Amino acid sequence: MLSLRRGLITKSYLNYKFVNHLAVIPRNYSNDSKYFFSKPPANDNNDKGSYADSKHFFTKPNGKMNSNEQIDQMHNNGSNNPNNNKNGSTDSLIGQAILQQRRERRKQVWYALGISIFAVLIGYSIGYKVIYLNEDSFIPLYPSSGIRKPSQNDLRKIDVPHIKLISHLRVLEVLSHHDMIKEQYGVPLHDSNGVNPPQIKEFNIWCEDQDPCVTGLIIRKDDPNRPTTHTWHRIPYLLQWRVTHRPICISRSISNFLEDIGLSYSTIYEIISPEKIYGSFKYEYPIPGDDHSMHIWFLGELQLNNDTLIIYKGKYHVDVKLQQVDLLRNEDGKLVRYVLFKENE
């Protein structure tokens, strides 16, 4: 019944006098998205301007590179000058503005990251460790030189006259057993004034850190009555601080980390191999406080006569140990050096 009704409707529609034939007419759609559902007018140049497609709103539809490609090219060339692409072009100006905005954004990110790290460091080192836990806090600043002059605190712990005396005796012993000195200068030795033995003309000492060190600030809570051997700067009723050196010891850092998590291997390690931690002396005590391992070097001079000078160098650790002894002599207007003694030779 439904099929019969559809057939009658179709037949009556085709017999209508205004309907001559049926045909499918293709529509000519424009590339412009605003005419996606409608037919553009015959003349729309005034509305569209010179850019027919909306995807070319910032670029020209002439097959040239777009703004992103220009920005990448400008970035690779390392220049902000828009004349590299096209002088005075709008695309270059837009690309330059976007590139400048990206750089400013990167700078802001780095500034924010640096300020955040600084705030966390100060908050943890001063606010938490010093004020809350009442502990000393060390803030590293820059790497320090391994060779330096001994401080006043170091000189209080080093017996310089004893080092000078022992080194003098060791040098005289080396010279007295050397064949060249025996033949040319005689034994016992005398200086140009006939003094026996020749006296030390100059003697210097310096310190050399055993491990790499960093210079930084050590900060603690203000306590004027706290005993100390160092000179501290104060922020009254708040903090005390001073500049110091700290070694970078990987094994000690690992040991401290293990102790923090409840593990420890130092006792067993000391029993098995004590020289690895405390040196070659079995009963040597560990270094207390904020002191660290260092070598004490010395350099001295002995004047045998007006043309001969003895220079010796060595290291002090519990006992004096000579490294090298040289003889400098003026021969025919030339300065000649003779190596009289060198360690392991």
From Swiss-Prot:
Its main location: mitochondrion. Residues 76-89 have a biased composition (Low complexity). It is found in: Mitochondrion membrane. Keywords: Membrane, Mitochondrion, Transit peptide, Transmembrane, Transmembrane helix. Residues 1-29 form a transit peptide. Residues 46-91 are annotated as: Disordered. GO terms for cellular component: mitochondrial membrane. The keyword Transmembrane helix applies. It is a single-pass membrane protein. The chain crosses the membrane at residues 113-133. Residues 64-75 have a biased composition (Polar residues). Belongs to the AIM39 family. This is Altered inheritance of mitochondria protein 39, mitochondrial. It comes from Vanderwaltozyma polyspora (strain ATCC 22028 / DSM 70294 / BCRC 21397 / CBS 2163 / NBRC 10782 / NRRL Y-8283 / UCD 57-17). The gene is AIM39.
